[in-house]
Amino acid sequence: MSKGTPSFGKHNKGKTHIRCRRCGRHSFNVRKGYCVACGFGRSKRMRRYSWQNKKSWTRVRLK
């Protein structure tokens, strides 16, 4: 059994992500045990950041 670069070829076997129980998206990491989309398994709160949504231009004064 060798380690390093030859071992990385074994990473493509099996599923990395399965369907999440909370958000329903195909983003629950089986190895890490949490959803990368909603944060299920890592946090009780939903994973949500302000940079995910585009900022509205209502406060900007047009020239």
UniProtKB/Swiss-Prot annotation:
Q: Which GO terms describe its biological process?
A: translation
Q: Which SUPFAM superfamilies match?
A: Zn-binding ribosomal proteins (SSF57829)
The residues that the entry says bind Zn(2+) are: C20, C23, C35, C38
> Quick check: keyword Cytoplasm in the entry?
no
**Named cofactor requirement(s):** Zn(2+)
Query: How the cofactor binds, per note?
Result: Binds 1 zinc ion per subunit.
Q: Name one GO cellular component term.
A: cytosolic large ribosomal subunit
Q: List the disulfide bonds.
A: none
Instruction: Give the keywords, sorted.
Output: Metal-binding, Ribonucleoprotein, Ribosomal protein, RNA-binding, rRNA-binding, Zinc, Zinc-finger
Q: Which domain of life is it from?
A: Archaea
Per the UniProt record, which residue ranges are transmembrane? none
In residue numbers, the zinc fingers (C4-type) are: 20-38
Molecular function (GO) terms listed?
A: rRNA binding; structural constituent of ribosome; zinc ion binding
> Pfam families given for it?
Ribosomal_L37e
Q: HAMAP family from the xrefs?
A: Ribosomal_eL37 (MF_00547)
Biological function = Binds to the 23S rRNA.
Question: NCBIfam families this protein is in?
Answer: PRK04179.1 (NF003214)
Protein family per UniProt: Belongs to the eukaryotic ribosomal protein eL37 family.
What PANTHER family does the entry give?
Answer: 60S RIBOSOMAL PROTEIN L37, RIBOSOMAL PROTEIN L37
Q: What is this protein called?
A: Large ribosomal subunit protein eL37
Q: Which organism is it from?
A: Ignicoccus hospitalis (strain KIN4/I / DSM 18386 / JCM 14125)
Q: From the UniProt record, report the name of the gene that encodes this protein.
A: rpl37e
